[in-house]
Amino acid sequence: MHKIIDSGRKRAVKDTATKKETLRFIKWLKKGKNVLYAIDQDYGIKHSKKINFFGIPTYTITTAERLQEITNCNVVFLDSWFEEGVLRINLEEISKNNVIASTEMISQRIESSIRRNPGEYLWHHKRFKSSLGKEFYKDAR
C-alpha cells in the first residue's frame, strides 16, 4: 500500500520524505523550498502534545512548529474543499507563537474544515490511536 501511495504522491510533487526523514525537510526548508506536511497524523506520543481535537485531548505532533523554530520558515495552513464542483483553496499563515499555541490553532483550523465538509476528510488514518488506544478502532472494521 505504501508503494501505491508514494507513487501517487511522486506524480504530483518533486520529492517525498517519510516521517523518519525530518532532516530532509530541514535541508529543503533551509534552501527556501516549500514543503507540504500533513500534521493531523498520529505518530505516537514521543513528539506530540495533548491538544483538544473535537473536545478530545488528542496526541498531536508538533513537528511543524519544531521545523519553524529550527529553520525560521513560515507555517501556512492549507485548507482545500470542493464547492459546486470547483476546488477551493484557502491559505492562512500560522503566527510564530509557542509550540502549544500554534498546534492548538492548527487543530482548530482542521476542526473547522472537517465541520464544513466532513466527507472530504481522510478518516481512515486512526487519528485517535495514541489517545484512545488501538482497541478503539477494533469495532470500526
Protein language model features and the residues they cover:
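Conserved nucleotide-cofactor-binding alpha/beta core module
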Residues: 1-33
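Non-catalytic C-terminal accessory region of glycerolipid acyltransferases
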Residues: 20-141
